[in-house]
Amino acid sequence: GLSPRTDRAGATALIECLKTIGYKGEIVKTPEGVLHFKTECSLLDEETFLVTRRMEQSGIFDGFKKIVLPKGEEPAANVIRINESLLVSSNYPQTIDLLDQNGYFVVPIKTAEIQKIDAGLSCMSLRWFAVK
């Protein structure tokens, strides 16, 4: 998304990279006050997003199922999905319960140290597919 951190050239370059591996993308603007999308939403499965109230109201995810974060737990939006597991900050018990109630396998992760530098799980991770 277009934001203070990503301009149209960067977003266009990402879409071109996605095309080379068979994916498509769409450029959208982040809602006012949103640093970047991973700050306020995460893809939980092929049709469901975990979102803050602000992202739900933006209309960006119309057509998708949305699970809205409990008030006060907005930083929990930064979730990492690995296969069928969701890595979620252990600091947000209501979010963990909400995801569990919706049938997701949740792995709580301690994040106190990375939160001191205003980072989320995806900011502090490297993920790649193993080449077989």
What feature does the model see in each segment?
Residues 1-132:
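Histidine/cysteine-enriched polar flanking segments
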